[in-house]
Amino acid sequence: MYDDSYVPGFEDSEAGSADSYTSRPSLDSDVSLEEDRESARREVESQAQQQLERAKHKPVAFAVRTNVSYCGVLDEECPVQGSGVNFEAKDFLHIKEKYSNDWWIGRLVKEGGDIAFIPSPQRLESIRLKQEQKARRSGNPSSLSDIGSRRSPPPSLAKQKQKQAEHIPPYDVVPSMRPVVLVGPSLKGYEVTDMMQKALFDFLKHRFDGRISITRVTADLSLAKRSVLNNPGKRTIIERSSARSSIAEVQSEIERIFELAKSLQLVVLDADTINHPAQLAKTSLAPIIVFVKVSSPKVLQRLIRSRGKSQMKHLTVQMMAYDKLVQCPPESFDVILDENQLEDACEHLAEYLEVYWRATHHPAPGPGLLGPPSAIPGLQNQQLLGERGEEHSPLERDSLMPSDEASESSRQAWTGSSQRSSRHLEEDYADAYHDLYQPHRQHTSGLPSANGHDPQDRLLAQDSEHNHNERNWQRNRPWPKDSY
């Protein structure tokens, strides 16, 4: 009687209870698995934090100059959240060691810059590809530099920019200390320019005693371009056309400068052949260009005339060189010494180099430097020195002239420019250089700043040269105190 009776919902509820009972172990397993993952993540992050702390006491392995912008705060894959570096294009990074294929450990070269995780070239390339895929899906197949712009360029222009961007590596390997190069007021090899620059060399030698290497370079460093060093065809042509210095000699000098910079001392080059910033613009040296400027062509003419007939014979060529320098936009130089007094110019330069010294020297002790950049995988293809031939043992050749020799005449060359007023000089040399002298070229551009982009869309963005110039250069003073 009771066997045939049916209680509605009995089997269903019983089956449901069984299902609930059997599903509990699965839920518990998922929770346990999630806890294991979280525990493993915390362990990995703890180890990464410890390695970050240990890196503070390690020496600098090598340095790079950035060609892209990157915001580490927005990168969720950083080994330690909040410990990623932020940098803009044309910034400089000191690399301490390799953490993984995607991450390095180092610091941004600036005062107070702390040790942080730096994306490797492979990591930046991965981010770039993801952004390109995202842009294509959104129907805007533009290059990274076009992200955030108001209007998309024509397809042909966009493809051209994208093709150009693909050939630009995210980093360029540069010396650990940017070498200082003096140019101006005119051509090297003539008395006025040589005496004024020698006065600065003597000052730097004494002011930074124990922290500076001043070395003479006779090879033509303008030949040290990546396109030349990595192209055997161009190398052969230049070796035929250049009687003064071969590519092998230039490459040897570049390696020697890199070697000098490993000590993290200030490196000053007395480069015979460098008279214009454009000569070093495409090299791997990333130099600090110091323009020794005479404010008026009339003053320079008077200084040249005061050196006698032997210098007067070359007045025209010296004035033409001066004219080319003063026409350069201010951002072509890192420091412009336009003071009338030697003491003021020396203090100006010393102030800049003191700030740079503090920017490059992290408070943590560093016993020295590691091997060359090629010791870290992934950098061989980005070396700016080209394929190495025979190994040359780098020699630190300090070719300073005796510090007291001709010091008085050097001082007179500086002070002579302020002996007479501009009014008297105009009267003496009216129209003497009127046809040759050209005023400064105005350097303007309407490109928007990369900082105006939405931070969610600019984890990695190609920066324009003008944006960097606007950020790092102040027109009122040739050298801003906050450059580093």
Swiss-Prot record:
GO biological process, one term: calcium ion transport
Subcellular location: Cytoplasm
Region Mediates interaction with the alpha subunit: start-end pairs: 195-345
Residue segments, region Disordered: 1-52, 129-170, 387-484
Every SH3 domain range: 59-128
Magnesium as UniProt keyword: no
Residues with the Phosphoserine modification: S152, S393
Composition bias type Polar residues, residue spans: 409-420
Domain of life where this protein originates: Eukaryota
MF annotations from Gene Ontology: calcium channel regulator activity; high voltage-gated calcium channel activity
Pfam family, one: Guanylate_kin
SMART domains per UniProt: GuKc (SM00072)
Bias (Basic and acidic residues) ranges: 387-399, 423-438, 463-484
Assembly and binders: Component of a calcium channel complex consisting of a pore-forming alpha subunit (CACNA1C) and the ancillary subunits CACNB3 and CACNA2D1. The channel complex contains alpha, beta, gamma and delta subunits in a 1:1:1:1 ratio. Interacts with CACNA2D4. Interacts with FASLG. Interacts with CBARP; prevents the interaction of CACNB3 with the alpha subunit CACNA1C thereby negatively regulating the activity of the corresponding calcium channel.
Chain's role: Regulatory subunit of the voltage-gated calcium channel that gives rise to L-type calcium currents. Increases CACNA1B peak calcium current and shifts the voltage dependencies of channel activation and inactivation. Increases CACNA1C peak calcium current and shifts the voltage dependencies of channel activation and inactivation.
PANTHER family linked to this entry: VOLTAGE-DEPENDENT CALCIUM CHANNEL BETA SUBUNIT
Family: Belongs to the calcium channel beta subunit family.
Protein name: Voltage-dependent L-type calcium channel subunit beta-3
Species of origin: Bos taurus
Organism classification: Eukaryota, Metazoa, Chordata, Craniata, Vertebrata
